Amino acid sequence: MLRALRGEAAPSPQNPLFLSAVAASSPVMEEIIYKVVFQATYQTLKPLLAFLHHDSFLYWPFILSTLLIAMLAWRFTRARGDLDPAKPHWKEFFDRYLSRRLWWHASSHLDYRFYFINAILFPLIVGPLLFSSQGVATALGNLFGMPEAQSAAPSFWDALAYTVIFFIAYDFGRFVSHSLLHDIPWLWQFHKVHHSAEVLTPMTAFRAHPVDLAVMAWVPALTTGIVTWCFYRYVNAGIGMITFLGLHAILWIFNLAGNLRHWHVWLSYGPTLNRWLISPAHHQLHHSYEPRHLGCNRGFELAVWDRLYGTLYVPPQAPETFRMGLGDGSDGQWRTVWQLYVWPFLMLWRRPPAETKTPQSAGDQ
């Protein structure tokens, strides 16, 4: 109509403008636009709904269990006489674990901002580059063969064996990933983002560069994918893991105290268990830049990998004093979300990987 009033010819079916208009109104384009809008909305809201996702440390049962275990650990510390008996119990707990000094620290504020932005950008930028253990198992099946699905259902013992071995492979994969981030100089530049935290809260767990997150996803996908293919190939193609509310049953148990790894609640499992399991105290010491702690305790659930690799530092029962951060004088370089994303690339640009040192290298600290 407007074209006619202006004396312009209407676009013909051969006109690119006409074709683009038709394409834009087609069902296929409508579906694509709907998916894009839906994904953008979902990724924007997902960080706010993490307390409903069982695969997040912010899942509400894990938050409740964290608070409960923190209170029990605090009571045990008081019973040992390590705290000030003159203070009321509730005030001591609040001052130690819930104070503004901790949760409103500049480093904590940066954790909060980085969490929301990273949760939106990571699936869009790095997500297409990721692969799953199921994808690895399928690829191995295409290469080496995959049996037809058996009519007989897998037994409970088969499922239990798969659940346990999958967990071991997953934990080993995460240890290998974490060690690569510490030992390979150019990867350490990206892992510095996580270690630049000056205080620890459960949100610090999400303070990780997308490159860091990709490495932490790739290796466990390989180790668990191999295990999955082996069970499909040699046990039962219909086998599945034992889960609880949609999450691997063993990981569920460990996640009950998982948030304490990044919180100033000292929970050590004792001299015997500490040699087999990674306690929250193990990982808190991992964030220390004291010379005796550098590069220690890289595992997540099992301490056996650190023992074999020579990086296990067994935490004492009483809280140990240490300083956190990078300790290399670069604190001012990790103050904004932009710096957390860009600074690792700038460091690699300014200093070739061969000249970049990891925390275990002489002269880095």
Regions found by a protein language model. Give the residues of each.
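Short, low-complexity, charge-dense intrinsically disordered segments
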Residues: 2-13, 23-24
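A membrane-cytosol interface segment of integral membrane proteins
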Residues: 319-365
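Membrane-interacting alpha-helical segments
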Residues: 34-49, 113, 117, 257, ...
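Membrane-embedded catalytic scaffold of the fatty acid hydroxylase/desaturase
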Residues: 117-129, 141, 148-322
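Short, charged cytosolic
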Residues: 30-36, 80-97, 179-195
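Specific transmembrane helices
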Residues: 57-146, 162-174
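Membrane-interface segments at the starts/ends of alpha-helical transmembrane spans
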Residues: 37-57, 105-108, 149-157
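Short, strongly hydrophobic alpha-helical membrane anchors
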Residues: 16-52
